[in-house]
Amino acid sequence: MQTTSWLEIAVEVDPEAVETVSEILARYGYNGGVVVEQSWIAGDEGPEFQYDPNRPVWLRTYLPLDAQAEETRQQIEHALWHVHQIRPLGPIQTRTLAEEDWANAWKQFYPVLRVGERTVIVPSWLEYQPQPNDVVLLLDPGMAFGTGLHPTTRLCLHLLERLVQPGQQVLDLGTGSGILAIAAAKLGAGQVLALDNDPIAVRVAHENVERNQVQDLVTVAEGSLGAGQAMGHWLSGDFGPETPDPTLHDNTPQATFDLIAANLIAKVLVLLAPDLATALKPGGLLISSGIIDVKEAEVVAAFAAVGLQQIERHVEGEWVALVHRRPQ
């Protein structure tokens, strides 16, 4: 039996460059996987951590050492060279890993993480003794986006803790690892629909839903709303040859959801604003995140144009999360 070797590509970046460099590595890395190695400050009690936003972040991706590996490595280096012209990056580091080393290399970077008052994210390979009232999310990210480590995910989890009400119909759009959908279910939602245009993310989300035993509450499917159907995997930045027509909303459910969590990026939120408004029930709430501060005004304007009312704004570093309500 032939054993596959892997090429690890790693680069140290400032926190503000994490999103840009992650998109590049996801575009070329195996299964779109990117490991985010952040600095953590240990809590006073138990395995609880806080992210240190003042220190650089290591990003890693992996390539199978096949005939295309060298060409792909050069493409990554070329793309990162362009980023380096506008943001500081550390030198690119590479190393070769055997199959068994690669399979576990990324797991060391995920600690048990408390987010908000009740939510605790526990990697599936670690043990954790829950405290009273803890909402435990067992997560194997499989190198898919949505581990709870990124500020945008943490902002959403904080809001879900407070906004999810018993029996609600919830949509998690761009579910990634399924973390927000699982959290909504465990916080009391009646039914949750988790959508993603990336088939790898859909598979990982399915596995995590079953791992958390919420498959009776959470439906995972490949897809998006209306105009998002034509986009492909939005996290890669590849929207296809043309921008989808924002007037195409035939696939958007009408007034279906009490709560929508859309942890995407600003330009996708702007494009999907009409679909998001249509999918909300009157009085329903939209949590939008993945918004870098310089793009916030565009999102606010797009949501206002479709009649959504902003009721909350939350910030972590350069990232913004908003809460909007559809009028009654």
UniProtKB/Swiss-Prot annotation:
Superkingdom assignment: Bacteria
One record GO biological process: methylation
One Gene Ontology cellular component: cytoplasm
Residues involved in S-adenosyl-L-methionine binding: T153, G174, D196, N263
InterPro entries listed in its UniProt record: Ribosomal_L11_MeTrfase_PrmA (IPR050078), Ribosomal_PrmA_MeTrfase (IPR004498), SAM-dependent_MTases_sf (IPR029063)
Gene Ontology molecular function: any one: protein-lysine N-methyltransferase activity
Intracellular or extracellular location(s): Cytoplasm
Catalysis performed (reactions): L-lysyl-[protein] + 3 S-adenosyl-L-methionine = N(6),N(6),N(6)-trimethyl-L-lysyl-[protein] + 3 S-adenosyl-L-homocysteine + 3 H(+)
Pfam families: PrmA
Top enzyme category: transferase
Keyword Nucleus: no
E.C. code: 2.1.1.-
Keywords noted in UniProt: Cytoplasm, Methyltransferase, S-adenosyl-L-methionine, Transferase
Family: Belongs to the methyltransferase superfamily. PrmA family.
Biological function: Methylates ribosomal protein L11.
Name the record gives this protein: Ribosomal protein L11 methyltransferase
Organism: Chloroflexus aurantiacus (strain ATCC 29366 / DSM 635 / J-10-fl)
The encoding gene: prmA
